[in-house]
Amino acid sequence: MTWQHVEAPTPTQQEANWLLQRPVVERVFGAPDPGNPQGRERYEATFSRGYLAHASISPSCGLALYKDTKLTVWTHCQGVYPLRAALSKILKLDPSSIIVHHVQGSGCYGHNGADDAAADAAIIAMQKPGQPIRVRWRREEEFIYEPKTPAMVVKVRALLDDAGKPVDWTQEIWSPTHNLRPGAGGNLLGALALPDPPPEPPPNDVPEANGGGGTRNGEPLYDIPAKRMLHHLVTESPVRTSALRGLGAMPNVFAMECCIDDLAARAGKDPVEYRLSIMTDPRARGVIEKAAAMAKWQAGAPGGQGRGRGIAFARYKNKAAYSAVVIELSVDEEIRLHHVWCAVDAGLVVNPDGVINQVEGGIIQSASWVLKEQVRFDNGVASFDWETYPVLKFSEVPEIDIELINTKDEIPLGVGEVTAGPTAAAIGNAVSHALGARIRDLPLTRERIMAALLKE
């Protein structure tokens, strides 16, 4: 597979700088920017994250059978109906002649190679009527060819009042699309080999009504009088990009909550106290207070000695479940997580065990993203196995305590992606507490730890 019309970043090109130079589609949300006519104190910071892989434990697989003018497909993809629509388009079959069965497989965590493997099987099956066709990608193929989650750059600008509280907040976001799932026939690798492939879809992202893609959780829930998002939808990428657990929420919350800790330090306030001082939502306050109590949070606890604690909060999409996370860790040459405390308010909890499983899974996966994961490029994708794309090991998983605030009078809220952002930011804040230095680029590698210490 050869990609055309894009300039792939090499190891000497940092993704953040590369993204800032790409063509974009501009979108603006929120209050107009008044500038700074009152000459208020100004805060600015920039954060970045590289491309990530879904890193499913098993490569993608699909099975197809074309018999008696009917196409039957078995797949572990996340959307059987969008896949059917895409197959109908590329194979020029009526949708009523296609049946797509969902079967259990390794977790997708978004849009990985499962749709592509199913499409590969379907395309071959159309040439071999009556013959079942099974396609299973190799590990290398999965890492190289599956859609990646986009690299992102997030810049935060805040104007502060005399008490050090934000009165104006701008979150500026650069990101390729998080929304190239199959549907109208686009974004299936196998379709590119057909005589009449579908046209490339126009640049788009998840609508704000559905939580946004690159802008997801880009607006603070805190009581800030004026808030806005500037979204630069990057229209070029060296690899296909699409959905991964949480979409843009993790880098947006990472940036936002690290900034909140920085503002607390500038104001001479404890991070928990500062958050509560700018938050009136009772359910948000509830999870912040609960997580702090679970961890026996001590205001003013000394840091900078290689061991630290951090806290972070978010309400996923600003309309799903609330969560706050406290993390204790140590930093030597690398970061070691010791304990995670998490409080979640998901409304009426119907299946507590299922909720806890989702919350724990989100914490572990987010920790892996923050500490280890990044797709590397060297004249193409250079991350193709577990050695070149390491993930968190079982031996590196910390002790995790979860407490559900079962607000039985409230409707149930989704929890599958609620802890990705707060976990990432809590790690970032704990590292800052342990080192006395802020690292704003993910993952938090040994090289970045050393660079931050030398800079300080």
What are these regions (language model features)?
Residues 1-456:
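Cofactor-binding beta-sheet edge motifs in enzyme active sites
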